[in-house]
């Protein structure tokens, strides 16, 4: 296990470089992301296990998301609390080379397409997912996908805002007024499919998992409640099984879905997950499928642990198929990493080198690099 401390800044997101097995980008925020500045760290893992800072960038607002470019090994995207997405060139100091400023609230995730490598998407608390093309030197979005508006158009029903109790208005941003989203459709995560460049998946605060096809006049083609009405915080496509996705949320569950089994009728009962992983004591903040096989899933949680799960193809190990059991048996996780001493907010797998290497970061101002296969 290797470690690095982001002194004074809490980790929110971390990603391995798609070009190098020893390069990591970490998005951090001061004061736990509630108010204050942010900092982007670009780190290198040395042969002796030390982790050093190649370069860092201070930002005017806290950083919540990070992604590497798929076309340039020196380009890194960040998303921040002021609604801004910034593109940094690590060969240049101090300032981003491009900024994208259409979002009206915090941007919690960014993801670069690994098929159409000219595109990335961003997910925001303003209820939208936006698609961008920085390669054309264009800082306006190509497409905006609106969670609630698309659902109302699809169902023909106008949904009333869910009342949210807010005893105190703590600003998440010091550079832009904290605009309330009374529709409760804050989008936490959005990902491009690994199998189709036109497909995007997103999850939001009203528990919906949504799939979009950017070629369609109404892009929303699948929409269902994934986490029992509680906030859905993270989602990911399986790299080896085109129709299999995973989601995680405040209900403390990571769920595996086969999209071929989801009924298109939004008025039907909630769909049944292919598998459920139970074990975290608090909400799961982030999950990621392994790039080295179709079954391993990594989750990190507010319970300060990181867990590795095995989505076995055996029917007897899948909770979703055990409706006849009075006490369904939860598939045990294969590994538990408990070095973090605060909320674990971000995790990622290394694409290169020996399979099993992952990186995690959290509010304890620590970045840990460790191998899931060597963990006892």
Swiss-Prot record:
SMART domains, per database record:
WD40
Q: According to the record, where are the WD repeats?
A: 58-98, 102-142, 182-222, 226-267, 279-319, 339-376
Q: Which domain of life is it from?
A: Eukaryota
Name the SUPFAM superfamilies for this protein. WD40 repeat-like
Write out the GO MF terms: peroxisome matrix targeting signal-2 binding
What happens in the null mutant? Specifically disturbs in the peroxisomal import of proteins containing a peroxisomal targeting signal type II (PTS2), and fails to grow on oleate.
**Subunit:** Interacts with PEX20.
- Recorded protein name is Peroxisomal targeting signal 2 receptor
InterPro entries noted in UniProt: PEX7, WD40/YVTN_repeat-like_dom_sf, WD40_repeat_CS, WD40_repeat_dom_sf, WD40_rpt
Where can this protein be found? Cytoplasm, Cytosol; Peroxisome matrix
Please state which protein family the record places this protein in. Belongs to the WD repeat peroxin-7 family.
Q: Name one GO cellular component term.
A: peroxisomal membrane
Q: Which organism is it from?
A: Komagataella phaffii (strain GS115 / ATCC 20864)
What lineage does UniProt assign to this protein's organism?
Answer: Eukaryota, Fungi, Dikarya, Ascomycota, Saccharomycotina
